[in-house]
Amino acid sequence: MKVFSRRVALLGLCAAGLAACSPQKAAFKGIDITGAEYARQLSLPDTSGKPRVLNEFKGKVVVVFFGFTQCPDVCPTTLAEIAEVKSKLGADGDKVQPILVTVDPERDTPEILSAYAASFGRDVVALRGTLEQTRAAAKEFKVFFAKVPGKTEGSYTMDHTAGSYVFDAQGRIRLFIRHGGGVEAMASDLKQLIAGA
């Protein structure tokens, strides 16, 4: 019995030693979705009609947000936070690429979407596909969106997933950041990814 106990104890010590030697996993504030089987590709036209794909942004940490220009709160808050994070990161802010995908291509014309995106930074890439293309992109990212009738005839708003998807500089999906997490938490996560976490 004593030999068995010693072996178990020795095995436990070996396991603890190996765990101590292995590299520390990054302590993200957002939800770590590294290796997810979704959000692996994005291919939509920008506001000039040029096809854009995620791979062209390799070398940067990419933050993808699905929203719309007439969104009263979540969208402008999220985009303003991303802009603030970029500023807070100083020179490293240039290593962050924000992408806005409209879920309301009906009202978000290229001109309106382009002006809206630019109000949160000249480097924000705004993507606008057909409704079918938008649905396909949303499905790939497991993003929900739906038109909700407004209070007046013909008016509507959009319900949509309120969070951002973050890719590392190698183009791998890494994080889902919920709306309302705050600038400090997002800055911490993006800083770790820029550093190669």
Model regions: which residues?
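Hydrophobic "lid"/C-terminal helical patch
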Residues: 13, 190
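N-terminal "domain-start" segment that seeds a small globular fold
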Residues: 24-55, 80
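Structural microenvironment flanking redox-active thiols in thiol-disulfide oxidoreductases
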Residues: 77-137
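Short active-site neighborhood of thiol/selenol oxidoreductases, capturing the structured segment around
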Residues: 55-74
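Short loop/turn microsegments at loop-to-beta-strand junctions
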Residues: 39-40, 62, 161-163
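Thiol/disulfide oxidoreductase modules built on the thioredoxin-like
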Residues: 133-189
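C-terminal motif of bacterial Sec signal peptides marking the signal peptidase cleavage site
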Residues: 19-20
